[in-house]
UniProtKB/Swiss-Prot annotation:
GO molecular function terms listed in the Swiss-Prot or TrEMBL record: rRNA binding; structural constituent of ribosome
Listed InterPro entries: Ribosomal_uL6-like (IPR000702), Ribosomal_uL6-like_a/b-dom_sf (IPR036789), Ribosomal_uL6_a/b-dom (IPR020040), Ribosomal_uL6_bac-type (IPR019906), Ribosomal_uL6_CS (IPR002358)
Stored Pfam families: Ribosomal_L6
Functional summary from the UniProt entry: This protein binds to the 23S rRNA, and is important in its secondary structure. It is located near the subunit interface in the base of the L7/L12 stalk, and near the tRNA binding site of the peptidyltransferase center.
Gene: rplF
An example Gene Ontology CC term for this record: cytosolic large ribosomal subunit
Family in the record: Belongs to the universal ribosomal protein uL6 family.
Gene Ontology biological process terms, A to Z: cytoplasmic translation
Alphabetic keyword roster: Ribonucleoprotein, Ribosomal protein, RNA-binding, rRNA-binding
Protein name (record): Large ribosomal subunit protein uL6
Gene source species: Shewanella frigidimarina (strain NCIMB 400)
S-S bridge residues: none
Subunit structure: Part of the 50S ribosomal subunit.
Length: 177
């Protein structure tokens, strides 16, 4: 059995956590996030800690409590520090630039790709082959990074494509005659 739910979430200074029935709101210096907590979980907020207790008689209550604890911890980290995903474009002619709230990508297709950034995610391009995505919601930042990577995933023969900064692409040997 996982024991994630047994550890409380510590709320740092400058972050405010409020609970209204099953809706939990976390406010911090970078913004605010709201999430509805499952009914199988009781949430208790006391002395800068958020505790998650399973409801008796519900079969998967411990699992739901562990999930809620992990999600709320990500919310607290997001509004206090934020989340960052870095992408690299590897390939001849692969470029990225920012136009307002859009990301213009040239990835070897016959047409340029325009990716609209959702609210809460900001992008910057330190160079034409680097993209830095940042935001308060870990799920949204990761989803946007995965969508951009999905346009041209790294291929195993030459390693061309869009990859995460810390991603290691397993290379294959070319076919021998």
């Amino acid at each position: 059995m996982s024991r994630v739910a047994k550890a409380p979430v510590t709320v740092p200074a400058g972050v405010e956590v409020t609970l209204n029935e099953q809706t939990l709101t976390v406010k911090g210096s970078k913004g605010s996030l709201t999430r509805v907590i499952n009914n199988a979980v009781n949430v208790v907020i006391e002395d800068a800690q958020v505790k998650f207790l399973p409801v008796d008689g519900v079969s998967n209550a411990w699992a739901q409590a562990g999930t809620a604890r992990a999600l709320v911890n990500n919310m607290v980290v997001g509004v206090s520090q934020g989340f960052v995903k870095k992408l690299k474009l590897v390939g001849v002619g692969y470029r990225a630039k920012i136009a307002g709230s859009d990301l213009d990508l040239t990835l070897g297709f016959s047409h340029p790709l325009v990716h609209k950034l959702p609210a809460g995610v900001t992008a910057e391009c330190p160079s034409q082959t680097e993209i830095v995505l940042s935001g308060v919601d870990k799920q949204v930042v990761g989803q946007v990074a995965a969508e951009i990577r999905g346009y041209r995933p790294p291929e195993p023969y030459k390693g061309k494509g869009v990859r995460y900064d810390d991603e290691i692409v397993r290379r294959k040997e070319a076919k021998k005659k």
